[in-house]
Amino acid sequence: MSLSNKLSITDVDVKGKRVLIRVDFNVPLDENKNITNPQRIAGAIPTIKHALDNGAKAVILMSHLGRPNGAVNAKYSLKPVVPKLEELLGKPVTFAPDCVGPEVEAIVNKADNGAVILLENLRFHIEEEGSSKDKEGNKTKADKAKVEEFRKGLTALGDVYVNDAFGTAHRAHSSMVGVDLPQKAAGFLMKKELDYFAKALESPQRPFLAILGGAKVSDKIQLIDNLLDKVNTLIICGGMAFTFKKVLDNLAIGDSLFDKAGAETVPKLVEKAKAKNVKIVLPTDFITADKFDKDANTGLATDKDGIPDGWMGLDCGDESIKLYKEAIDEAKTILWNGPAGVFEFEKFAGGTKATLDAVVEGCKNGKIVIIGGGDTATVAAKYGVEDKLSHVSTGGGASLELLEGKELPGVTALSSK
């Protein structure tokens, strides 16, 4: 799956056509149905405007919201999105009461002069995800013929298909892979994600550094394994580092996080790093806590003495930060996935903040810095530096699967140039 040769919305003639766009309007709503963070709606505006500015007959938007589990549930209606969307677009938006069916087709086919239509939640139909779960976790599979019918129903609403929902690209859902139109293009959000991940995974400027944090080694084995084929240097930080330190250096780690399952793969990963000539950087000092709490008492532990029993490492210390900065200074391409400590607690946010400051500085000096979604994107938002980095991915699960070397169904489904 090449990321850099996919058809983009700018390659497609939309004049006089119905443009069906899969957006990600899965926004947080409070109990009064007010949107608490409209970022995802704002993110889709350039793609929608491009279609309108280039003479689209109509723009039809489809999305999911929450997890209604294949049934209609007013709590998850997309209707509350309409006012915000109208405000950001500066034009009226028609809300369709469903996402498929004769009534919806009539609304869509009547629309012209660049009308914008928002369809109701795709996941009100079990055929979108292909299955649903009840409260006990029992799965019901969708009927194959009905899934086909649902996909035909979506296909009937457009002449050109555009996917701008990178965050759902790792899901083989009907709206991601089942729309059967001759041209299936990436929107601007999707295109930016693919371009930057191609810069890292297909043609990085070297030296290429990956910074991997987070809690469990076992969650990141595939990620580490895939990146060892691509990077020059790998910083392993966060809770995951303690498992490496204990296995490799027999360091006393006290009550710090230890991942027994992940520990078994550490020697194999380190062996691969040696074979591939990848330098692994681990922390050498730690900010410790007497309990997992924002108000915990703190201490400092080093490689020499280890972490005493009853204490746990929740962040890295100044010596480690120096090592990280050296690696960041040397690199030309930096990919960061997973914080360096428990940044949610102010006392243990120092390592993550210092790492962030160093990559922001690097970006200012021309380095390519990519933040791989999830917690690390939260860190960039917390300190308000998203616009000071080359790219902050919007897809937690999708970016992780891409970095693990997996094919993303929603990307594979797009037309190639």
From Swiss-Prot:
Keyword Disulfide bond among UniProt keywords: no
Gene3D superfamilies assigned to the protein according to its UniProt record, in alphabetical order: Phosphoglycerate kinase, N-terminal domain (3.40.50.1260)
Alphabetical keyword list: ATP-binding, Cytoplasm, Glycolysis, Kinase, Magnesium, Metal-binding, Mitochondrion, Nucleotide-binding, Transferase
Cysteines joined through disulfide linkages: none
Positions that bind CDP: 214, 219, 238, 338, 340, 343
InterPro entries reported in the protein's UniProt record: Phosphoglycerate_kinase (IPR001576), Phosphoglycerate_kinase_CS (IPR015911), Phosphoglycerate_kinase_N (IPR015824), Phosphoglycerate_kinase_sf (IPR036043)
Binding site for (2R)-3-phosphoglycerate: 23-26, 39-40, 63-64, 66-67, 122-123, 170-171
Enzyme class: transferase
Location (main, coarse): cytoplasm
Residues engaged in binding AMP: 215-216, 220, 239, 313, 344
Recorded metabolic or biological pathway in which this protein acts: Carbohydrate degradation; glycolysis; pyruvate from D-glyceraldehyde 3-phosphate: step 2/5
GO molecular function list: ADP binding; ATP binding; metal ion binding; phosphoglycerate kinase activity
Residues the entry annotates as binding ADP: 214, 238, 343
Compartments where located: Cytoplasm; Mitochondrion
GO biological process: gluconeogenesis; glycolytic process
Cofactor list: Mg(2+)
Family: Belongs to the phosphoglycerate kinase family.
Function text: Catalyzes one of the two ATP producing reactions in the glycolytic pathway via the reversible conversion of 1,3-diphosphoglycerate to 3-phosphoglycerate. Both L- and D- forms of purine and pyrimidine nucleotides can be used as substrates, but the activity is much lower on pyrimidines. Negatively regulates the biosynthesis of acetyl-CoA from pyruvate in the mitochondrion.
PANTHER family named in the record: PHOSPHOGLYCERATE KINASE (PTHR11406:SF0)
Subunit: Monomer.
Protein name: Phosphoglycerate kinase
Source organism per UniProt: Hypocrea rufa
Gene that encodes it: pgk1
